[in-house]
Amino acid sequence: YMDYTNCRDSIHKSELSLPGGTLPLGAEVQQLVFNFNCTPLRDMYFVKLKVINKSLLVWDSTYISNMNDIDIGASSDDAVGCDSLKDISFTYNFYNSDNDYGTNPPAVGVRFLQSPLVHTGNNSDTAKLPYDTLIGYKVTGMSGFIRVIEGTCLGDLDEAPIAYNFMRGKDGCGNALINWVTGRPTTYVYSGNACSHSGWYDSSSGDRRGLANSGPFTMNSGDTQIVVLSYMITRDGGNNLQNVCALQSLSDSALKYYYNDFKTCVPIGIEPISSEIPQRYELLQNYPNPFNPMTKLRFSIPLSRGVAE
């Protein structure tokens, strides 16, 4: 399945909430949505965004953000979080029972498989892509995750300044966010361990929306940036919290397939063929040249079996 979308700027009103009411930037966004009909990738789909600066202006301090309003069954009992090391944001059911899913409701996550590239010129910086590893570049990754809730500074993205503040990893009023556990400024809300409910995690249920950000970077006129996201769902963990751990593991699998350019649809890894351990081995002298049609290859096996020539 593939879905192609070609987006371009058009004038929109400020009350259109999520766009933030900005004027046209001169951006072109080409979107490709795809998935694979095979077991390892059955619980995920992928979104590739190609963003082109078609204007004559330089976009300074640019961010690309992914806004999601995910409801795990009923919308009133969800929680959100993120893993800043894996570049993933997620939504899960706060309780292990849901009116729609019943027990063991799934977790849903979105991971940045590829984020905007920044040229540093430093040979120690590398950016891994499916087809190459770029020297002197780095990826911006998921630079922040924001939970959007009701309130003056934490509410919807109704205006451009509010939207941009959220994208920078601040609240809508431009204030730094504080990790409630460490007491230090952060751009990652609920970055604790949701599986074990340790660190800073979402400690109450409700209708949740989340904004995952990547930036800042500069786009000159004519520049192109590519972002690839994987959307995943799983209930393999066994309960609402452990499903978050299973989701993080599933996202690692998605990243491996992406780096392999989706060339194969078999599990990545080594599968044991046999549990038997050889007692010894012997390399016989197959002389003359084995490619000579007159050469006979000697071999032996420890069991008495018929062997077809």
Where do the model's predicted regions map?
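Extended, loop-rich substrate-binding clefts of extracytoplasmic carbohydrate-active enzymes
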Residues: 1-48
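Terminal connector regions
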Residues: 44-46, 232-267
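Asparagine-centered strand-capping/turn motif at beta-strand->loop junctions
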Residues: 51-56, 233
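Glycine-rich (often Gly-Gly/Gly-Pro-rich) flexible segments and glycine-rich loop motifs
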Residues: 60-203
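Short, structured beta-strand/loop micro-motifs enriched in basic residues and often containing a Trp
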Residues: 202-211
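Short Pro-Gly-centered flexible turn/kink motifs
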Residues: 218-232
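Glycine-centered coil/turn sites that cap beta-strands in beta-rich domains
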Residues: 271-287, 291-309
